[in-house]
């Protein structure tokens, strides 16, 4: 019984911070892949003023886009140089025709998603989903609220509508080198992905064996928590499939429990 409003990508682009500044908590969709600079800056400003973000997905804040200044609903994306993509911009077409700015991955624009979210795109696969195991960080005092009612050795999300697990389709991981805050807690990570799950191409300089889920430690989803300025915070699940596990057993499960734990705590203005 928590009141909510739905804000679209266009709302965030055209209204900026004003679209979300009055909310104590913003909850993302499961696959917020495309963001303009206006959208990115709005979320960054929201966090800096003490807003709290629950990122319930993966492959988010990935491609930089541009909206047409006169035609509503029209966006431009340039799939430059790198990243998982189904088509590629031709040489000389890396800049937006709408604005003249460079397109492509936000990571190549100096803004890896880890800087904003704690996690960023790392792997994808489309056979079955998996589950999470708790990490040592999960037992630290500041983040114990996340696991209220969840056992020390419970498998988190070994069920669900999307591949029978909460960690699946596309996965995000923490990486300090890419901007995950040094004080971020990596409280849980997914395990036992198949070799259908492969590391994304921007992580590789040359093609090599061992990029599948059975061998490569980059094939995982991380659940992270970090604080931002003025009492703000970010909690990220690292998986598109997370939402598919919420309704399992009439919402009586540890994925739903954890999500509710975080939402209730984020609504509470008390400092962490």
Where are these regions (language model features)?
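Mid-to-C-terminal "cap/lid" subdomains and adjacent gly/pro-rich loops that border
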Residues: 81-156
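Catalytic or ion-translocation cores adjacent to nucleophile or general acid/base/metal-coordination motifs
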Residues: 45-105
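Helical hinge/lid and interdomain linker segments adjacent to catalytic or ligand-binding clefts
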Residues: 1-69, 246
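Extracellular ligand-binding/catalytic regions of CAZymes and related secreted enzymes
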Residues: 62-78, 126, 131-272
